[in-house]
Swiss-Prot record:
InterPro entries for the chain: Cof, HAD-like_sf, HAD-SF_hydro_IIB, HAD_sf, HMP-PP_phosphatase
Keyword Thylakoid appears in the UniProt entry: no
Annotated family: Belongs to the HAD-like hydrolase superfamily. Cof family.
PANTHER family given in the database record: HMP-PP PHOSPHATASE, PTHR47267
Gene name linked to the record: cof
HAMAP family registered for this protein in UniProt: HMP_PP_phosphat (MF_01847)
Biological role stated in the UniProt entry: Catalyzes the hydrolysis of 4-amino-2-methyl-5-hydroxymethylpyrimidine pyrophosphate (HMP-PP) to 4-amino-2-methyl-5-hydroxymethylpyrimidine phosphate (HMP-P).
Organism: Salmonella typhimurium (strain LT2 / SGSC1412 / ATCC 700720)
Active site per the UniProt annotation: 8
Protein name per Swiss-Prot or TrEMBL: HMP-PP phosphatase
Amino acid sequence: MARLAAFDMDGTLLMPDHHLGRETIATLARLRERDITLTFATGRHVLEMRHILGTLSLDAYLITGNGTRIHSLEGDVLHRQDLDPQVADTVMHHAWDTRASMHVFNDNGWFTGQEIPALLQAHVYSGFRYQVIDIKSIPAHQVTKICFCGDHDDLIRLRIQLNEALEERAHLCFSAVDCLEVLPLGCNKGSALAVLSNHLGLSLADCMAFGDAMNDREMLGSVGRGLIMGNAMPQLIAALPHLSVIGHCGNQAVSHFLTHWLDNPHLPYSPE
């Protein structure tokens, strides 16, 4: 039986309205009753995740910023990785040929250069929001990650520009169809989960993980049991064809799967 369960948030544990369903919350509590350690592995900021955790009365480790930070149950930093300052400086100051909006993250919060109210819909559960600022004024040595939000085709073209400018100095990935992330080289949820597993005296084979986007690829591909959401990006399903696909986040598919796993561990699972 798995001893550590890792959950992506958006498109996985959260429903389409960005809330946690009652069944999901109850199932997470059942895992803790079985002494299974929980970790939420997300692109969201730790400041936001602490608020969400506080509403759940659950103990969980936090992997945030797509692996740039790991926090203990007590809130202590177990691991941190920032963007190379030269990479951050290049990304923040270059005039990219794109319509996408730029968003910069550091330990103090989420920063962007203009009001984009539509982006706040994903944060209604926590009330977390961006701070409008001149992005070029942010110290490059304090940046954890940078992301661009916009049309997918535009972001694909932007990724080509970023790859040419940054070469092998950063890790680029899509955390959603409309969100392209610039992360520290070698930084992803999978590498962070490996650090956490080692800290807990476990191996990745002792873990199960759930996700729906390309920023979940390394995590899902490295654990003992990786499970892909039915609403996942097609690229993720194609990249990990050997993994099982469960149901849709709107139907609380993670809870559905885990309830079956807890009650009938030796029987085959069907998402129907």
